[in-house]
Each structure stands twice: as C-alpha cells, then as structure tokens.
Regions:
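Signature of uroporphyrinogen-III synthase
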Residues: 1-258
Length: 258
C-alpha cells in the first residue's frame, strides 16, 4: 500500500508548475486535483530597460524563485547581458535547478529555502559598495533589499513577472469537495491562499477552513492560521518537502486509528 492511497490532494500551483507536485502525489498513491490559484505573467521587456542596463555592471545577482529564474533569464537573453564578473545566488534548490536548466550553473544556494537563509551566507555579509540586482516578481518581500542596503549595498530590482489571480470556474472542485473528495490543500504562498478563497467564494469558505492545509514555510502557515484554517501543517520547502509533509501526516493519521 502506497502512503497516499485513497487520498486526494488539491494542488494550487500555477498551471506551468503544477505538474511536478501532481506527479509526486500520484507516485505516492494519491490523486492530485489541479486547480491553479496563482497566475504568472511576464513583465513587458520595455518596462525592464533600466534594470537590464544596471544589471550589466552588477557585482551580485540574486534570483529569488524559479519564476524569477525563468522569466528573468528570458528577459536578459532577449534584451540584456549577464555581468561578466558577477556572482550569482539562488533562493532555494528549486531556483538553482531552474537556473541550471537554462544554462546558468554554479549559483550559490543556502541550505535553507528562504531569504533569511540566503542573507545568512558568508558571501553576503561584507557587501558595502557592491551593486546588487534582485530578480523577483512585482512587489516581493522587502527583507532582502532592506537587509542588504543596511549592509551598505546599492540594491536595484529587476521585477520580471507579475502574480495574478487566474480566472477559474470552481464548480467541479466544489462538487468534489462537498462529496468529501478533497483530503488536503497545498499552497506555496499566502497570496495563493487568498486567491483560492476568492475563487471558491462563500460556498467554499467552510470547506477550505476545515481541510488540512500544507504550507512549505512557517510564514505561510502563520498567514493560513490567521485566515482561519483549522489545521495547518508546515512542511519543508519545495515539492519534495510538501510531499514529505503529506505522507508523514497521513501516515500518522492512519496509524492513530489502528
């Protein structure tokens, strides 16, 4: 018997990223119900002209997510150039893999999967006078830029994609959920949770609140608890971390009944 036999997991990642987690759930014996609650749109190249010009002379370039790697490198290859002497950093192994898949090998990656872990790296302590470009989505967290500026760095952003709430019809999902057919919800950001709640509307609010929710970071888990989700489980980062959290939770849940 596989660990997720008989379980259906709601996968809310953007459509172009949902397949990996859905496949992992399937391989563990479960069923993935894919309902993207976050959309990703590239920023127009003309809007990135200033950032691309600054990037060419940067000392440090930080990619904060797989989307930053995908859309950032696409924009750079279309209209810009990577700095010859720059050092490259990636938040989390998923971002490093996304960079490597597009030919940018050797990005420095912390053991942890968040900005705090990256900022703890020895290479980012003495950055006074360094030119830093943070490649991210529009409106990301200020922690990284604030911290690096406090350390004396000259920080600029290259905001290469926007997060959106995708149009979606929740009727099929709601019908399945009402019939007891959704056993767990996975989210990768607080924004995804808010979008999901908006898409489900009032009919889905009690279903969402009562279903175990798995989040790959304590900050996301805290946001879910404040939102009113009754059972929130924090997992390690990435798809592998979410899967481990799902497997361990349902294994313990099943074991407690025997």
């Amino acid at each position: 018997m596989l660990p997720l036999d008989g379980r259906t997991v709601l996968v809310t990642r953007p459509a172009h990223q949902a397949g990996s987690l859905a496949q992992k759930v399937f391989e563990a014996g479960g069923e993935a119900f894919v309902f993207p609650a976050l959309g990703i749109e590239p920023v127009a190249l003309d809007e990135l002209a200033d950032a691309l010009a600054y990037l060419a002379g940067a000392d440090i370039v930080i990619f904060v997510s797989p989307n930053a790697a995908q859309y950032g490198l696409a924009a750079i290859r279309a209209r810009g150039t990577l700095p010859d002497a720059g050092r490259f950093f990636a938040v989390g192994p998923g971002t490093a893999r996304a960079l490597a898949a597009q030919g940018l090998e050797g990005a420095v990656t912390p053991d942890g999967q968040d900005s705090e872990a990256l900022l703890a790296l020895p290479e980012l302590q003495a950055v006074a006078g360094q030119r830093v470009v943070i490649v991210r989505g529009v409106g990301g967290r200020p922690l990284m830029s604030d911290t690096l500026r406090a350390r004396g760095a000259d920080v600029h952003f290259m905001e290469c994609y926007r997060r959106t709430c995708p149009p979606a019809d929740p009727s099929r999902l709601l019908a399945r959920w009402r019939a007891g057919g959704i056993d767990a919800v996975t989210i990768a950001s607080a924004e995804t949770l808010y979008n999901l709640a908006r898409l489900l509307g009032e009919p889905g609010a009690p279903l969402l609140a009562a279903t175990p929710l798995f989040a790959p970071h304590e900050k996301i888990a805290e946001a879910a608890r404040r939102f009113g989700i009754a059972r929130v489980i924090t997992t390690p980062g990435g798809d592998d971390g979410l899967l481990d959290g799902l497997v361990n939770w349902f294994r313990n849940k099943t074991g407690s009944k025997t």
